[in-house]
Amino acid sequence: MNRLLASALLVGSAVVAPVSAACIKNATVTEVDVAIIGGGASGVYAAARLIDNNKTVVVLERNADRIGGQTETYYDPTTGTPVNVGVKVFSNTTVTTDFLKRFDFPMGTLNVGQTLATGTQYVDFATGKLIPNFTAVVPAVQAAAMQRYAAELAKYPQIKFGYNLGPQVPEDLVLPFGKFMEKHNLTGMAQTMFEFNSGYTPLLEIPALYILKYLDTYELQSLQSGSFIVAANGDSATLYRNAAKFLGERVVYGVSGMHIQRSSAAGGRVTISVGNSTTGTHMIRAKKLIVAAPPTLDNLRSTGLDLDTTEAGLFGKLSAGVFYSLVVKDTGVAKANLRNRHPANPYGFPDQPFIYSVIPLPKTSGLAQVLLGSASPLTASQVEARVAADIGRLPASLRGNATSVPKVVTMAAHTWNVMAPVADIKAGFYDKLEGLQGLKDTWYIGAAWATQSSTTIWEGLEQEFLPKLLAAL
């Protein structure tokens, strides 16, 4: 992409005013094969593979200085140690390792099961009391439960990369996951499911469909083998820094306003106008549009997408929880990983919103990572208050006699688990949603269509989505 386009589209944090027809008519125009909204795992992978197939692309990214979506890293200003506050692990598949190698990602391995079992103490954060003799996992029982889970998962190949549920949605898929576990004797893996499915809250009430999609074949195999890929240098964002160098000026950063017009006519074009009072307006005309952003109605409207009533009606059914990954100072927690349980509840799962865990971070200036889940968005002040209160009531023995108030130094809020109501799922919601693919030259990809797993997103793009898109170009 030429420097003129890059400079014309660098809008920083300015708010873009509505674009008039006259502005669009007089704007500079750049033609591309595909415009991509969102530079996360799906958008970046799609862009790279389209370039491999000799297609021209532009990636429109809201962040002012990075791509990578939910892959975020905090760097301790005192020690420089990286702390991943987003994506930490990848499943080991050929598509995954090829993509990581392509961008010189330093690969290491992590045994998640071993990590959960090592140096952990269980605490009721609602009371601050230790829970003695809490047994999270019985290895043989869990292994047998995982085998039964794998057998259930194998019944639904139609949800591997999408939601091809058909007219008769299997009843098991809309069962609350707690009932699904009981029905299929999976309770022996409940504790690991709770930790591994962080962000899916309340876990026992979420339709089994979404849990089966998240803990899919790739993730389950990695969990069973104990082998996930991690960044050997501790910094998952390495992948996207290197990918950004490859994409170069094909990425437009800091996009805070757009106006998108699509045509229903065959062979039409998608017109995207971007600009502000400083740079003026620039227009991109694309053969196809990829939306690689969470498809909640508010989020799509914020992109300037010209949704019709059918599209708005469908996307308006979707809602999402939020998973907060925090770096906190002055916790005093230094010797053990603290995991939250409430003994009075089924399986000890705490009431949401709640802290999942407090993990001390080695090689930092006394920092800890705190994970918090909520079925609905919280304000920053609500998150900070929850962290201060819950950690503040821990006994002195766990806080090293610290008396200072814990303070959040960075907060990554991730849109998590975009879901539809059960009644709509039963009524064929996902068949209708899948029917939007390709209409008005618009295609949708990302976690809401695959799952919150980079590996599954990339596998789905490679095996199913990209062949269809390339055939349509």
UniProtKB/Swiss-Prot annotation:
Keywords: FAD, Flavoprotein, Glycoprotein, Oxidoreductase, Signal. Gene3D superfamilies: 1.10.405.20, 3.30.70.1990, FAD/NAD(P)-binding domain (3.50.50.60). Pathway: Secondary metabolite biosynthesis; terpenoid biosynthesis. Diterpenoid pyrones display various biological activities and subglutinol A shows insecticidal and anti-HIV activities. Residues 1-21 form the signal peptide. One of its GO terms (biological process) is terpenoid biosynthetic process. It holds the Pfam family NAD_binding_8. FAD-dependent oxidoreductase; part of the gene cluster that mediates the biosynthesis of the diterpenoid pyrones subglutinols A and B. The first step of the pathway is the synthesis of the alpha-pyrone moiety by the polyketide synthase dpasA via condensation of one acetyl-CoA starter unit with 3 malonyl-CoA units and 2 methylations. The alpha-pyrone is then combined with geranylgeranyl pyrophosphate (GGPP) formed by the GGPP synthase dpasD through the action of the prenyltransferase dpasC to yield a linear alpha-pyrone diterpenoid. Belongs to the beta-cyclopiazonate dehydrogenase family. This is FAD-dependent oxidoreductase dpasF. The lineage of its organism: Eukaryota, Fungi, Dikarya, Ascomycota, Pezizomycotina.
